[in-house]
């Protein structure tokens, strides 16, 4: 079966391409893509005008990390730069990631 991909677009125009299964670990992204009423679902694309690329990139890294190490016993540390912590917390809360 061929993997399905989605495009996540930051407010400053950067595009991140993820497997849909991984992107949908975010409750918000899953809701946007799985509701047929959103045009984003038709295009497999989500635009986040209020999220900068540096934050969206870190969220994408975390979604991959979460997918890879889910149900593992030996999980490496996920590093977050201290200057990014507060903004990333707000972003993760919004994305339910």
UniProtKB/Swiss-Prot annotation:
List UniProt keywords, sorted A-Z: Cytoplasm, Nucleus
A GO term (biological process) for this protein?
transcription initiation at RNA polymerase II promoter
**Presence of keyword Nucleus:** yes
Q: Name one Pfam family in it.
A: Skp1_POZ
Q: Gene3D superfamilies per the record?
A: Potassium Channel Kv1.1, Chain A
InterPro entries cross-referenced by the UniProt entry: ELC1 (IPR039948), SKP1-like (IPR001232), SKP1/BTB/POZ_sf (IPR011333), Skp1_comp_POZ (IPR016073)
Instruction: Name the GO cellular-component terms.
Output: cytosol; elongin complex; nucleus
Indicate the principal place this protein occupies in or around the cell. Answer: cytoplasm
Domain of life of the source: Eukaryota
| Subcellular localization, as worded in the UniProt entry | Cytoplasm; Nucleus
Give GO terms: molecular function aspect only.
Answer: protein-macromolecule adaptor activity; transcription elongation factor activity
Relate the protein's function as given in its record.
Answer: As part of the CRL3 E3 ubiquitin ligase complex; polyubiquitylates monoubiquitylated RNA polymerase II subunit rpb1 to trigger its proteolysis; plays a role in global genomic repair. Prevents degradation of interacting proteins by the proteasome.
Family statement drawn from the similarity comment of this UniProt entry: Belongs to the SKP1 family.
Q: How does it assemble?
A: Heterodimer with pof4/ela1. Component of a CRL3 E3 ubiquitin ligase complex consisting of a cullin, the linker protein elc1, the substrate receptor pof4/ela1, and the RING protein rbx1.
This protein is called Elongin-C
Q: Which organism is it from?
A: Schizosaccharomyces pombe (strain 972 / ATCC 24843) (Fission yeast)
């Amino acid at each position: 079966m061929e993997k399905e991909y989605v495009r996540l677009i930051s407010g400053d125009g950067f595009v991140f391409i993820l497997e849909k299964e991984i992107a949908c670990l975010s409750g918000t992204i899953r809701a946007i893509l799985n509701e047929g009423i959103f045009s984003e679902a038709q295009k497999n694309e989500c635009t986040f005008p209020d999220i900068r690329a540096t934050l969206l990139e870190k969220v994408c890294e975390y979604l991959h990390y979460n997918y890879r190490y889910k149900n593992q016993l030996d999980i490496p540390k996920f590093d977050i730069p201290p200057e990014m912590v507060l903004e990333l917390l707000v972003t993760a809360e919004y994305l339910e990631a």
